[in-house]
Amino acid sequence: MKFIFFDLDGTLLPMVQDDFVRCYYKLLTTKMSKFGVEPKKLIDALNYGAYQMTNNDGTMTNEERFWICYEKIMGISKDTYINELNEFYETEFNEAIVSTKPDPLARKIIDVLHDKGYQVVLATSPLFPQSAIYNRIRWAGLTPEDFVLITTYEKYHYCKPNLGYYQEILDNLNIKQEGYLMIGNDIGEDLSSKLAGFRTYLVTDYIENRANMSYKPDMKGSLQDLYEYLKQL
């Protein structure tokens, strides 16, 4: 079988990451402040949880790692507001689409790959629950059914750029590395897949390079360039 791997944020769903995070945090803190939750403490819990998930060592899922961090910072059980948080990701979270720039090319890209018989993997760093990731897929004009596998925090034990993340995907697909193509916009996170044997395509419309790293992808270009390239496969 033929596989191609995609990042989501900034790639299939064009966005400036910081703009999205600010919008997301504002929406969440606005909702939770109605229940007496202090916004700063909640943001601290989210940031600490994200940091620890990014550095997860494989001994527990990212979801389990996050809630340990959340309870430590918030000083309350995760069960206190679990229903409200789950509801947020199903409802108000969708308002954050205004911080993104959906492009019809995403739909065309996935369709052309399906027409060519490719299995498409959504290799988005699993920092979010499934509901939040599925909704962002829909913002991009896609559906969860477009992908043979989607990485969410409920099921994964690592995050990008940990090589364990990429190996976990291969293991879950029950495939061996054969130089599969990883497509993304983040220098540190997506291009790290080269160390796991992937070929890389850097989408340049919304490059993220927080650590100001030097980089040399196998290929690079805009989302339009990517579409033209994939049509020729």
Locate each region found by the language model.
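A metal-dependent, Asp-based hydrolase signature
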Residues: 47-90
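Asp-based, Mg2+/Mn2+-dependent phosphohydrolase catalytic module
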Residues: 1-4, 111-112, 125-127, 133-233
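Short histidine/acidic/glycine/proline-rich micro-motifs that form metal-
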Residues: 12-14, 52-53, 124-128, 155-156
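Active-site neighborhood of HAD-like aspartate-dependent phosphohydrolases
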Residues: 1-45
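Short, acidic loop-to-helix structural element flanking the phosphoryl-transfer center
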Residues: 61, 80-83, 90-121
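Short, solvent-exposed loop/turn segments at secondary-structure boundaries
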Residues: 16-19, 57, 214-215
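Short, flexible loop segments at the rims of nucleotide/cofactor-binding pockets, characterized by
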Residues: 96-100, 129, 157
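Hydrophobic alpha-helical core bundles mediating ligand binding, dimerization, or RNAP-core interactions
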Residues: 21-29, 46-50, 67, 85-93, ...
